[in-house]
Amino acid sequence: MSKGSSTKKWLHEHTSDYYVIQANKLGYRSRASFKILEIQDKYQLFKPNMFVVDLGAAPGGWSEQVIKYIGKNGKLIALDLLEMAPIAGVEFIQGDFSSDETYQKLNTLVNNQKIDCVISDMAPNLSGNKTSDQAKSIYLLELALDFANTNLNKNGSFVAKVFQGQGSDEYLKLVRESFNKVIQFKPKSSRAKSREFYVIATEFKG
């Protein structure tokens, strides 16, 4: 299949996708909003006054939902390499999470406060090389877990998108070392063909 044909196929599937249509109808920033809503409905992670950090936040599908749960007295920091239009109550950092400069900016905003929940929908820019792309994905996941391990409150929680493949089982073992409860969850709003699932980790051991 030519690149042009595959692009047309993706566009057709995207524009006819139920969750894309619903997101547009409801004014959500992306279909990803439904994933975090499903996670919240099932696991009740977000509560008023919580401090949450959203990694890989753009275009804001997760942040716009989470801020509703944590309320005006909660704190939400969102970070992404791409631009994100402002969301009331959300502090945004644009930068590469893997860079020291961006990591320092995030730490400055965190200001030694303990975080209640770290959520990550990060994914690398795909090159088409599955082995390389998977390795980059695992690297970002490890960075997110390291950040959570350093900054979470005891009994805090961690949510991250994982692509099933080389290194994913080993990654789950690392998560289990830090949390008492670790669950693999594939939302209904995840595309059926996608290898993605979400790790829901609660009761951080501290």
From Swiss-Prot:
GO terms for molecular function: rRNA (uridine-2'-O-)-methyltransferase activity. Keywords: Cytoplasm, Methyltransferase, rRNA processing, S-adenosyl-L-methionine, Transferase. It catalyses: uridine(2552) in 23S rRNA + S-adenosyl-L-methionine = 2'-O-methyluridine(2552) in 23S rRNA + S-adenosyl-L-homocysteine + H(+). Its main location: cytoplasm. S-adenosyl-L-methionine binds at G60, W62, D80, D96, D121. The active site is at K161 (proton acceptor). InterPro entries: RNA_methyltr_RlmE, RNA_MeTrfase_FtsJ_dom, rRNA-MeTfrase_E, SAM-dependent_MTases_sf. Transmembrane segments: none annotated. Its EC number is 2.1.1.166. GO terms for cellular component: cytoplasm. It is found in: Cytoplasm. Pfam families: FtsJ. Specifically methylates the uridine in position 2552 of 23S rRNA at the 2'-O position of the ribose in the fully assembled 50S ribosomal subunit. NCBIfam families: PRK11188.1. Belongs to the class I-like SAM-binding methyltransferase superfamily. RNA methyltransferase RlmE family. This is Ribosomal RNA large subunit methyltransferase E. It comes from Francisella tularensis subsp. tularensis (strain SCHU S4 / Schu 4).
